[in-house]
Every structure is written in structure tokens, then in C-alpha cells.
UniProtKB/Swiss-Prot annotation:
Keyword Plastid: no
Protein name stated in the entry: Uncharacterized acetyltransferase L280
Active-site annotation: C52 (acyl-thioester intermediate), H89, D104
Species the sequence originates in: Acanthamoeba polyphaga mimivirus (APMV)
Disulfide-linked positions: none
This protein's record includes keyword Kinase: no
GO molecular function, one term: acetyltransferase activity
Assigned keywords, A-Z: Acyltransferase, Transferase
Membrane-traversing stretches: none
Database matches in Pfam families: Acetyltransf_2
Protein family: Belongs to the arylamine N-acetyltransferase family.
Residues forming coiled coils: none
């Protein structure tokens, strides 16, 4: 079955088993790793942690194995000056009965359920807004408690080379290039409390 209930169950299961972690950024001192799909899947499923590009790529693989129609897309966070960071967030859009849902397991906070991508809809404190765009791009602004989180560009990302460039740019980035490069961050979703927590034991 590929319905919203199953999607939510898969999300919650994945989020409670896999830790969002940027620890590799602080541990890898050699050349930045490449985004090789087979290596990423093997590493993520074995180590059970990663950043957005690891986790959401692995989860998209899980979804496809369960028969879901899904694709990867780029999303962008804002700097304090309102401009967008160059390094993008990799996330997932799932199509169920003609409706599009955001299914993000790689943010490390905010998201725990599928969010239907319709203007003005609020799901689990997450609000979707569709800005007035002049270039006919399909854009969704995602907010939490009226605070901007990320802007999604609804265009299937099919190029592994593009993801690889973004992946390597992350590992080359400095503290001023992206907040995630400033300090270690580990979070896992606790279904009992319904929120993200610091893992009791950090995997090595």
C-alpha cells in the first residue's frame, strides 16, 4: 500500500532509527567524500546517521522499494540577510492520489510527518505558503510558528553529479558558509515524546 498512513509510518520508523548528524564534517580531515549512490546507501544503512543528502537519499530508496512515487528536490535555507545559502538542502516530494507531500527525514528538527504541499495548509505546526512567482517556478515556502524554515523548488533532481558537487561543497565549507558547519549537531526523533532529542549514545 502506498497511502499517507503508510508514508507516515515509514517516516516515523526511519526518523526514530536514523540520527541526523554532521559528525563526519568534523571527523573527516582528508579530501571531501564523493556522493557515490551505492556507497552512500551502504554507509547510511550500516551507520544509521548522516546529513540531509545521506538520509533523504536513503529514505527515497526505501520509499521506492515500497512502491511510492517520489523524487528528490532542492531546498534552500536563508541567511540572516535574507539571501539563500549556496549549499542546498536535499529533500523528498512524494505523490499520493495526485497530491504532493513533503517527506523530509534529513533536517534534524521540525519534520516528523508528511506535509501536504498546498498553500495555507498547516500540518503538525508546519505551514506551507506558495509565493507569487513571475518565472512560473513551483516554489513552496515552509514555515514553523510563522518562522521561515526552507524554500522548496519543485523540480525533480535527477543529476547525481549535481548532488555530488553539493555534497563536496558541504565538506569544503567553513563556519561562515553554513550554520551546520559551526558545531556538532546530533538529533534523533523520539516517538514517545513526539520530538527530536539528543541521542543518549552517539555512534562512532
Amino acid at each position: 500500500m502506498t497511502n499517507i498512513t503508510v508514508l507516515e509510518q515509514l517516516m516515523q520508523s526511519f526518523l526514530s532509527e536514523y540520527t541526523f548528524s554532521n559528525r563526519d564534517y568534523f571527523q573527516i580531515k582528508s579530501e571531501p567524500p564523493k556522493f557515490d549512490p551505492d556507497i552512500i546507501l551502504s554507509k547510511t544503512f550500516q551507520n544509521k546517521y548522516g546529513i540531509c543528502m545521506d538520509l533523504n537519499y536513503a529514505f527515497s530508496h526505501v520509499l521506492k522499494k515500497h512502491g511510492f512515487n517520489c523524487y528528490l528536490v532542492k531546498a534552500f535555507e536563508k541567511k540572516s540577510d535574507g539571501q539563500f545559502y549556496d549549499i542546498y538542502h536535499l529533500t523528498i516530494i512524494v505523490i499520493i492520489n495526485g497530491c504532493k507531500y513533503l517527506a523530509d527525514v534529513g533536517f534534524g528538527k521540525y519534520f516528523s510527518k508528511p506535509v501536504i504541499l498546498k498553500n495555507g495548509v498547516t500540518v503538525d505546526k508546519i505551514r506551507v505558503e506558495v509565493p507569487n512567482m513571475k518565472n512560473n517556478e513551483n516554489i513552496y515556502n515552509i514555515l514553523s510558528h510563522n518562522k521561515f524554515i526552507v524554500q522548496i523548488k519543485d523540480s525533480p533532481l535527477l543529476s547525481i553529479s549535481d548532488i555530488n558537487d553539493n555534497y563536496q561543497n558541504f565538506f569544503k565549507a567553513g563556519p561562515y558558509d553554513l550554520p551546520l558547519c559551526r558545531k556538532p549537531y546530533d538529533r534523533i526523533y523520539d516517538q514517545k515524546v513526539g520530538d527530536y532529542i539528543i541521542p543518549q549514545k552517539v555512534e562512532k
